[in-house]
């Protein structure tokens, strides 16, 4: 991992915030990076920033340019590199929940940073036709860290495989002092898929007993209801 220290060895403040030593527990911030046309409606695309005492982590990277392969989805882009409040250089670690185009299209912005992805997902993205935009997967300088199964990336931040949306999908489980918070990518695209889980990945997310679950294509997090049963 590329530590974020200044020349004195002290952690650098981020965007007017205090130093990392002042952050008692990880916090999660959703960032809107695009809208896509899906089934006649505009669908948001979010990435998520984890501010951890040891590193700033970005979960998924959105997309930064148009491509003929997805022109029918009429992308409206708000790339991270053009957002005034977002410090591209301040990201230490990248995690891809999976490698569909709207989750890896900004990976090139973080060349040289460790980018964690399940090995199965990376293999599929590189070998299967019509899976993703391969030029975006292997953009110059992207440094993947292939993962096999569960992995603790930082204390209290771990990766959990959740096959379903793709065989190599994973979620990020963040311990915040109570029940965990999950950043789930497209393991569930809509709330209803967690209300009534059908895929192995969706059932695994519910089994984590999360306080809330951030999804890539919903404006608000999903929260379990007391009368729901897996």
Regions found by a protein language model. Name each.
Residues 114-119, 182-185:
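Short hydrophobic/aromatic-enriched beta-strand-loop microsegments
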Residues 1-58, 63-67, 201-212, 221-230:
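Zn-dependent metallo-beta-lactamase
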Residues 38-40, 55-93:
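Pre-active-site segment of Zn-dependent metallo-hydrolases
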Residues 105-111, 224-228:
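Metal-dependent catalytic neighborhoods of phosphoester/phosphodiester hydrolases
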Residues 24, 110-111, 140, 209:
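Short, structured coil segments at secondary-structure junctions
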Residues 15-18, 64, 75-102, 117-161, 167-230:
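Metallo-beta-lactamase
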